[in-house]
């Protein structure tokens, strides 16, 4: 196996996004600011949902899992990128690269499946309100969430192990700010066509299958909302679902854009920009979208800060 012919001392070089020009230095600190907002926002969401018993519902449990995944995702890539930029070092060990690929792919895959579960939750809440507590009881909700983590992690293991079964006999410079398998495949001196097909199949499973569930769920939700007699009920349903659809659109738009193209057609700059969007920008926007458009989250935050009223 090619792995046996490589040592963990054979480091890769992450070329990153930024150089040390004034413009790029400004952009680097902008990314750090976005990271800080994303880190604090998702941490607050997890803590709020854990601490406030009124948020102990399936919808908010799933939202806390999404925030946890986003929190882990940004911590997988940004700290290493920042360390390399500030220290002037570009190296990452093979073990470090394998670990980064595992968490990176696992978390992206897990989010795909979790977003599908969240859409099913909204479907049951709006279309089957009388059966909601039974259909989304804690055991079922926990199992669906666990399967999201397991399926995503399985894909991460496959990609991490398969990617490092190749030999790297030329340049070890990765034209990215993190270890990303399309960038690594370019460096391999093996025929990667079969593995590219495997990647495409994984993308189908991780993206198209969950998207089908989301589209089906929201098609039924829209029909149910149209037939609602109460204007207040329509408004509440629209507000809740539109927040989720905004997140789905941002996340799947970038993911589908990356996956529908063969690896050989990827350009380094294109990969970097799209990756920055769904690994740094989207995790920052998710808690803002849900908190600004959700009175219960806002109330919980005010209560924790001591500004809420106990009778609210």
From Swiss-Prot:
One of its GO terms (biological process) is detection of chemical stimulus involved in sensory perception of smell. Residues 1-25, 80-100, 159-195, 260-272 are extracellular. Keywords: Cell membrane, Disulfide bond, G-protein coupled receptor, Glycoprotein, Membrane, Olfaction, Receptor, Sensory transduction, Transducer, Transmembrane, Transmembrane helix. It is a multi-pass membrane protein. It holds the Pfam family 7tm_4. GO terms for molecular function: G protein-coupled receptor activity; olfactory receptor activity. Its main location: membrane. It comes from the Eukaryota. The chain crosses the membrane at residues 26-49, 58-79, 101-120, 140-158, 196-219, 237-259, 273-292. Disulfide bonds join 97-189. It is found in: Cell membrane. Residues 50-57, 121-139, 220-236, 293-311 are cytoplasmic. Glycans are attached at residue 5. GO terms for cellular component: plasma membrane. InterPro entries: GPCR_Rhodpsn, GPCR_Rhodpsn_7TM, Olfact_rcpt. Belongs to the G-protein coupled receptor 1 family. PANTHER family: OLFACTORY RECEPTOR. Odorant receptor. This is Olfactory receptor 2M7. The lineage of its organism: Eukaryota, Metazoa, Chordata, Craniata, Vertebrata. The gene is OR2M7.
């Amino acid at each position: 196996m090619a792995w046996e012919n490589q040592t963990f001392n054979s480091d890769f070089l992450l070329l990153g996004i930024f150089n040390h020009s004034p413009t790029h230095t400004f952009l680097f600190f902008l990314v750090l600011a976005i990271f800080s907002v994303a880190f604090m926002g998702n941490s607050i969401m997890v803590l709020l949902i854990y601490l406030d018993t009124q948020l102990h519902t399936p919808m908010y449990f799933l939202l806390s899992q999404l925030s946890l995944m986003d929190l882990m995702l940004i911590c997988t890539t940004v700290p290493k990128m920042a360390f390399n930029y500030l220290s002037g070092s570009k190296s990452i060990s093979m073990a470090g690269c394998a670990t980064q690929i595992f968490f990176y792919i696992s978390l992206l895959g897990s989010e795909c499946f979790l977003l599908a579960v969240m859409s099913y939750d909204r479907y049951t809440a709006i279309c089957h309100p009388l059966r909601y507590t039974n259909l989304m009881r804690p055991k079922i909700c926990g199992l669906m969430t666990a399967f999201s983590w397991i399926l995503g992690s399985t894909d991460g293991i496959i990609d991490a192990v398969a990617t490092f079964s190749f030999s790297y006999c030329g340049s070890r410079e990765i034209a990215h700010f993190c270890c990303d398998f399309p960038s690594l495949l370019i460096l391999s001196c093996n025929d990667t066509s079969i593995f590219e097909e495997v990647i495409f199949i994984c993308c189908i499973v991780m993206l198209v299958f969950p998207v089908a569930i989301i589209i089906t769920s929201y098609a039924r939700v829209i029909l149910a909302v149209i037939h609602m007699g109460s204007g207040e009920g329509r408004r509440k349903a629209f507000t809740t679902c539109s927040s989720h659809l905004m997140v789905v659109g941002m996340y799947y738009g970038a993911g589908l854009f990356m996956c529908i193209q063969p690896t050989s057609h990827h350009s380094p700059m294109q990969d970097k920009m799209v990756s920055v969007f769904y690994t740094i920008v989207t995790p920052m926007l998710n808690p803002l979208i849900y908190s600004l458009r959700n009175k219960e989250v806002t109330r919980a935050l005010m209560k924790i800060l001591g500004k809420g009223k106990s009778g609210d």
